[in-house]
Amino acid sequence: MSMTSPSPVTGGMVDGSVLVRMATKPPVIGLITVLFLLVIGACVYCCIRVFLAARLWRATPLGRATVAYQVLRTLGPQAGSHAPPTVGIATQEPYRTIYMPD
């Protein structure tokens, strides 16, 4: 036994089950969308966690620059000096260019 009611637009009879399906469709679509976004968000979160835990970020150009900056900061003030490098620490012999014959 089907419930029918007059349609306000056409004046004809509309089946009640169609109205019920149409009324429940937007919330179901919204629920599916929210669940889909949660799953995508969880996947992105897990990928970022693995990326950071495996230290893969160091392989990127920004990661290499970051590591180089950290190393330079740990070296202290001697890293920025412009003094020529020395060959022997005890003798303080200055660095000399060695020319190779052709």
UniProtKB/Swiss-Prot annotation:
GO terms for cellular component: host cell membrane; membrane; viral envelope. The chain crosses the membrane at residues 28-48. Keywords: Host membrane, Membrane, Transmembrane, Transmembrane helix. The keyword Transmembrane helix applies. It is found in: Host membrane. Disulfide bonds: none annotated. It comes from the Viruses. The keyword Membrane applies. It is a single-pass membrane protein. This is Protein ORF28. It comes from Human herpesvirus 8 type P (isolate GK18). The gene is ORF28.
